[in-house]
């Protein structure tokens, strides 16, 4: 496999993020706000540190995003019983509608991305992505272990 494949994968990832950001803008959200809302739906009841790591952003950046979404009434912060300094994030009832529309927008984006792929190709592609994720995690393990 050539380095060209790696470049193509990186370029596709960048294009996907750009399209995602454009589509969620139509819902009145920034890309980071939308990613946080989707993460809150997928991984509920975690603290802000978890979401900052998941979204690969600095905690202070996440705090700004959380502040805006909290002001809009879409999320709420609660004290973490295990750590009084930490805050657990939750979606609010008000956010359910926007999250549903957001998920539909993302699903449409993925359909556009996979246009022309039949169901067998989509299944193979999904398995390949899982293997890539496993390989990347394994490659990172020595880094994590040795700091």
Label each PLM-derived region with a short phrase:
Residues 1-27, 93, 143-147:
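N-terminal leader segment of winged-helix/HTH proteins
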Residues 3-7, 27-38, 63:
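Short alpha-helical elements of helix-turn-helix
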Residues 8, 15, 19, 35-38, ...:
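Pre-recognition alpha-helix immediately N-terminal to the DNA-recognition helix
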Residues 17, 45, 49, 67-130, ...:
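Charged, amphipathic alpha-helical coiled-coil/dimerization segments
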Residues 40-43, 57, 132:
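Short helix-capping/turn signature of helix-turn-helix
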Residues 52:
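The alpha-helix within a helix-turn-helix
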Residues 60:
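Key DNA-contact positions within bacterial/archaeal DNA-binding proteins
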């Amino acid at each position: 496999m050539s380095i060209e494949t790696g470049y193509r994968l990186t370029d596709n990832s960048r294009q996907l993020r750009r399209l995602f950001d454009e589509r969620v803008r139509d819902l009145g959200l920034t890309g980071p706000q939308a990613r946080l809302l989707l993460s809150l739906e997928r991984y509920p009841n975690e603290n802000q540190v978890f979401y900052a790591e998941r979204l690969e952003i600095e905690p202070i950046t996440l705090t700004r995003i959380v502040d805006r979404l909290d002001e809009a009434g879409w999320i709420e912060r609660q004290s973490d019983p295990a750590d009084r300094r930490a805050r657990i994030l939750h979606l609010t009832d008000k956010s359910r509608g926007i999250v549903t529309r957001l998920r539909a927008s993302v699903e449409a984006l993925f359909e556009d991305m996979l246009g022309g792929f039949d169901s067998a190709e989509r299944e193979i592609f999904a398995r390949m992505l899982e293997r890539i994720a496993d390989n990347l995690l394994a490659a990172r393990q020595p880094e994590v272990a040795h700091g």
